[in-house]
C-alpha cells in the first residue's frame, strides 16, 4: 500500500483547465523497413535485435528529426514549434506566465532545456520557468508545478511541453567505437542488447498543452481533477540510464568519473535499459500506486470513459490489463486509447500527444472522464492524471 505524504485532500483556490493542445512531428513518418536507412548500421551489420523488438512493440511508423546523417531540428526547436502551435492572433504567446517543459534528451547539460526553449520562442517578456529532467514523467512533473501555480492564483496561464530528440542518440555512429573495440577483442562486434534494443523503440517529436484558470468559452477543455506522481527509487535500483555505467552492486558511475576513452569504448552516453528489471517491476509498481489513488479518490471503472496508457511497447498491454483487473479496475478494450503504432514512443511527449489527438479529432464529449497513466522506467517513477471534459 502506498503511503502518501498527506492523506488530506488538497484544497486549491480554483480549478485548472487544459484549453489548447498542439503537437509537432518532424519530417515524414518512417516505416519499420526504413529505420536503418535513417539510423544507420552499427559496424556495417544489420541489427539482430531490430526484427524481434519491432515484432513486439507494435510501432508501425515514427518520426525522426534526422536525415542523411544530419539533424533537421534540435530538441529545442521541436519543443518551440509545438508551443507556438498553441497560440494565434486572438491569444498571443506573450500571454503566458509560466513555461513548464520536460525532456529526456536535452542538447546540453547547462543551461536548462527550458531556458533554451524560452530563448528560441522569442517571447518579448520574461516568464517563470520550470524545466524537469527525467524521462517519460518529466513533462507531467513540470505540468504539476504549473497547475499548482495557477490553482493557487499565482499565475493565470502556462504553456507545458514534452519533447524528445532521440535519433541522434541512436545513430549508428554513436556506437561505432564500441563495436570496433569488440571486434578487436575478437568478439562478434554486435553491441549489447540493452543498448541496441532502445534504438528501435524511441523516436522524436513534441507536444504542448496550454493551462488556464478558465475553460474555453467555445469548444471543449480538459479540467484537471487530480494529478499525482511518485518515485520508487527508495526501493528499486536504476533500470534505464544514459551518461553512466551501471556497477554490479546496482550503483551508477557517472560520465564525469570515467575516462574520455571509456566514453566512446563503452558508449557511455547511449541510452541503456535493463529489460529484466523492466519486466519485473514496471507494471507491478504502477498498479500499486494506482490502487492507493483508487482509494484516495474513490476511483472505479464506471468513472473512466477513456484510458490513455503511455506504453513503450504494445507488449505491455496485456500485463497492464491483467494488473488493472487484479486491483479491481477492469477497463474494457473500447475505453483504451493510444497512438503508439502511429507516432512511436516519444517519451515525455507521449502523454500530451495522446491527449492532443483525443481532443483534436473530436473523439470526446462534455462529461467524459479520462485517466492518463505515465510510467517511467528510469528509476521507477509514475504519474496519473484524471481529467473531465468540460
Stretches with model-predicted labels:
Residues 72, 76-80, 105-107, 119, ...:
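Claisen-condensing/thiolase-fold acyl-transfer catalytic domains that form or cleave C-C bonds
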Residues 167-192:
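Short, flexible helix-coil linker/hinge segments at the edges of structured domains or between repeats
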Residues 2-72, 188-280, 375, 386-390:
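Condensing-enzyme catalytic core mediating Claisen C-C bond formation in acyl metabolism
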Residues 20, 102, 133, 158-164, ...:
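Short beta-strand segments
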Residues 30, 110-112, 143-144, 169-174, ...:
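Short acidic, glycine/serine/threonine-rich loops at helix termini
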Residues 94-102, 301-310:
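Short glycine-rich phosphate-binding loop at a beta-alpha junction
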Residues 154-176, 232-240, 313-314:
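Acyl-CoA/ACP chain-elongation machinery
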Amino acid at each position: 500500500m502506498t503511503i502518501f505524504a498527506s492523506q488530506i485532500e488538497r484544497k486549491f483556490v480554483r480549478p485548472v483547465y487544459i484549453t489548447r493542445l498542439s503537437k509537432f512531428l518532424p519530417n515524414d513518418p518512417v516505416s519499420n523497413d526504413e529505420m536503418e536507412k535513417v539510423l544507420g548500421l552499427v559496424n556495417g551489420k544489420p541489427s539482430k535485435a531490430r526484427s524481434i523488438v519491432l515484432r513486439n512493440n507494435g510501432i508501425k511508423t515514427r518520426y525522426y528529426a534526422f536525415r542523411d546523417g544530419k539533424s533537421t531540428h534540435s530538441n529545442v526547436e521541436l519543443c518551440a514549434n509545438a508551443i507556438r502551435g498553441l497560440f494565434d492572433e486572438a491569444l498571443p504567446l506573450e500571454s503566458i506566465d509560466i513555461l513548464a517543459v520536460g525532456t529526456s534528451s536535452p542538447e546540453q547539460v547547462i543551461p536548462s532545456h527550458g531556458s533554451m526553449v524560452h530563448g528560441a520562442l522569442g517571447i518579448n517578456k520574461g516568464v517563470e520557468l520550470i524545466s524537469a529532467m527525467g524521462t517519460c514523467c518529466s513533462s507531467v512533473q513540470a505540468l504539476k508545478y504549473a497547475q499548482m501555480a495557477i490553482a493557487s492564483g499565482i499565475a493565470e496561464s502556462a504553456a507545458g511541453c514534452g519533447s524528445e530528440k532521440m535519433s541522434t542518440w541512436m545513430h549508428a555512429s554513436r556506437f561505432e567505437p564500441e563495436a570496433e573495440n569488440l571486434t578487436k577483442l575478437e568478439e562478434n562486434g554486435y553491441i549489447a542488447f540493452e543498448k541496441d534494443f532502445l534504438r528501435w523503440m524511441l523516436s522524436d517529436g513534441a507536444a504542448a498543452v496550454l493551462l488556464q484558470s478558465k475553460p474555453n468559452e467555445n469548444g471543449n477543455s480538459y479540467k484537471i481533477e487530480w494529478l499525482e506522481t511518485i518515485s520508487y527509487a527508495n526501493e528499486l535500483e536504476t533500470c534505464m540510464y544514459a551518461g553512466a555505467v551501471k556497477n554490479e552492486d546496482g550503483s551508477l558511475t557517472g560520465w564525469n568519473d570515467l575516462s574520455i576513452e571509456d566514453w566512446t569504448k563503452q558508449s557511455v552516453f547511449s541510452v541503456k535499459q535493463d529489460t529484466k528489471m523492466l519486466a519485473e517491476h514496471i507494471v507491478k509498481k504502477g498498479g500499486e500506486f494506482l490502487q492507493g489513488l483508487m482509494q484516495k479518490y474513490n476511483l472505479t471503472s464506471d468513472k473512466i470513459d477513456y484510458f490513455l496508457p503511455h506504453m513503450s511497447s504494445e507488449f505491455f498491454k496485456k500485463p497492464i490489463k491483467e494488473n488493472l483487473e487484479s486491483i479491481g479496475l477492469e477497463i474494457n478494450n473500447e475505453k483504451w486509447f493510444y497512438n503508439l503504432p502511429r507516432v512511436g514512443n516519444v517519451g515525455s511527449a507521449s502523454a500530451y500527444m495522446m491527449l492532443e489527438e483525443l481532443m483534436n479529432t473530436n473523439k470526446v464529449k462534455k462529461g467524459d472522464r479520462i485517466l492518463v497513466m505515465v510510467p517511467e522506467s528510469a528509476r521507477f517513477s509514475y504519474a496519473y492524471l484524471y481529467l473531465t471534459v468540460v
